[in-house]
Amino acid sequence: MKKKLKWIGIGIGCAAILGLAALIWALDIPHWQTLDLNKIQNYQQAAILFDGNDEEIAVLAGAQHRRAIALEEVPQHVRDAFLAAEDARFYEHRGIDVWRIGGTLLANMRSGEYSQGASTITQQLIKLTHLTSEKSLSRKAQEAWLALQLEREMSKDEILEAYLNIVYFGGAGSGVGAYGIEAAAQTFFQKSASELTLAEGALLAAVIKSPSGYSPIDHPEKALERRNHVLQAMAEYGYIDEPQSQAAQQEPLALSVAEIEQLPYGWYIDAALAEAESLLSLSADEILTGGYRIYTALDAQAQASAEALFQNGANFPDPAEDGTPAQAALVALDSESGAVVALIGGREYNIRRGLNRATQIARQPGSALKPVSVYAAAVDAMGYLPTSIVDDAQHTYAGGYTPGNAGGQYYGKVTLREALSRSLNAATVELANRIGIDTVRMYAQRLGVELDEADRNLALALGSMTQGLSPLSLANAYLPLANGGMWSEAHVIRRIEHADGRVMYEHPGQTERVLSQQSAYMLVNMLETAASSGSARALSATGFPVAGKTGTVEMGNAAGNRDIWTVACTPTTVVSVWMGFDEPDAAHALPEGTGGSGYPARLAAQFLAEIADRASAGNFALPAGVTQALVDGLALEELHQPLLATSLTPKEYQLVEIFPDGKVPRETSPYWRIPETVTDLQASLSAEGRPEIRFTALEEGVDYVIMRTIQQERRAIATLQGAPGETLTFVDEGASSNQAAKYSILPRHQRLYEMGRLVTGDESEAVSVEPRRQWSWLFGG
């Protein structure tokens, strides 16, 4: 029996050892954090942001947002409010409250309100300073273990003071969130925490459970209800009596919201924080309290210029009849790296982390999508050139789709350059139909445009998409056009460092070739035409080379436009500008005459001119493999083929065009040549005895000037035209019947003569006509 009990004991011991080992493994105890009092006692862990030159631009949730206060300065009724709301047995337990864990469920069920959680104030302080928000058994066990240790290292009052100075209370108005009770009192009541009333203290104790959900600014009714629950709990726990509780519950919220100092570059900073949260997989609270040093790509001068332009109402369309302002956004990227150098998310910046239209909206880009979808595919995949011809005529495609040009005018056979620079819808859709919508989709996606599976129709050629694009995404898609075909992801942040100096993130600087260098140049060169004389010609106001494209999206079932765009490129900078209403409808639409070529293009031009030191970098570099050639515009217009200009081609018809090596035209234009000499001139007398001359017309566009010489007098007596090979005849009715005359033909360039320029070929050899001798018919002469 003893032997049996011995083995049972051994078995139980082994099981206990194995169970303990399993528990240690499950809770990952060897990797638990150790208590670090420095994190609690030195809690100024602000996030610091730097610009592209490593100059500090903002300190978030740092000294100016958290104001430390000693516990003895906090009124007892305020301390009691936090104890009633968060940990009524705070001064009785040793870090964890075993009784409370069991009683919490009953208390919550009885009150119908989550008046208490299971975590003590000590545990909450540990979570705020040592742990993440991860919900796991290991994290909860660490929290309890560290709370027990903390209670041995710090007094209850020290723990409560640290908690009140660290906990987050949310934000108000245009300010960032308040950290610590002193900052919260200043934010919501414009007074020190030492002056808080019972009702005010209870409100602050109420909001920390969910600073956004119980925000007295955004959700005053919920905040009031939660405050009154805290006041009721104070009475139940004996901190105040029932009459005091009821009296305080009758008081209104009585907020006095502070106008917190406006931080500079608000839109840009918001974008940086959002990107940091995504890169590090952290919450906003963790970023703002973690002591991170965030190095951005901000160009402070460019951002300041953009902000100044957005403060001028004359730069934007008129508001709707009900006063709702038209909104706008701007993004500027470094062409080489994709770094965001400036960003504006709306007309006014009046709330931290509000809707950032530069990054968060998705709108139809309209014709602004054409260069990075249809034309990119045509040039890079199919070998189209700026001089290639496409038909600009109204067609009906599968499904009854019948796109039309703005204004209802069509131009027949046009070059790709003309179709893109003049934003001809019919020509663009016909081009997309030729090359195939799958190829168009492939190139749009290659340039970073996210498409839905439903975006597989010809309407995509005109920028009709299921989801739409943000100004940032559209600017990013244009990046390869300005950067020789290389794409890199647009980014705000260059590097993030932890408070201890560890590099948490470094932008990889990766680039990807999405277009050939030659294709990118041809595309941006065509967009230079759009910016100088086409739909985006307002960009020419910069005074330096710019390429660009506009976009206008109609309302559809109502009059007016819903979105207007301009994207502008220089060799160093890409700028995207959007304008429209946040919630477009029949009453909130831009007027029909307000398109992308207006306000957005002018704003983009002003912005680029303001940052000329950055944006002005001369011409886009002609890459190897591309050749410039002087071609005849008339031949392109009438013969629909690129032919070389001649020395006679008028300046207004001389076009500098670009061609890949091997595709440069070799033939010259037939329109601007010295006329050929007539070689078959004949002359005789007509039946009436008048000089009659005959010759063959040799070419189009030539005036054949008939020259007559009688004795010493030489004069032009007539001008004839004819088709090549046609026999031309002229009877000189004005000739004298008794004088000999000589006739010749002077070929004259018809078009040049009409333009005021005399260009002739060699005069033909003269032929003579003798008059009939009188009475010669009697003698057979």
Could you describe each region identified by the protein language model?
Residues A81-L83, M234, A306, S337-G338, ...:
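Active-site SXXK
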Residues K2-Q311, N315, A339-V340, A393:
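Juxtamembrane regions of bacterial inner-membrane/periplasmic proteins
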Residues R110-E134, K191, E261-P264, G383-V440, ...:
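Conserved catalytic neighborhood of penicillin-recognizing serine enzymes
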Residues T296-A320, L330-A332, L343, N350-T359, ...:
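A penicillin-recognizing enzyme superfamily signal
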Residues A46-I57, V74, I294, G323-I351, ...:
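A short, well-structured edge-of-sheet supersecondary motif
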Residues M1, A547, G551-G781:
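Soluble, non-transmembrane domains of envelope/secretory-pathway proteins that act on or interact
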Residues Y91-I101, A178-Y179, D241-Q246, L355, ...:
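Short, well-structured active-site flanking segments
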Residues Y401-N405, G436-N476, E489:
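Mid-domain, small-residue-enriched loop/turn segments at the edges of structured enzyme/sensor domains
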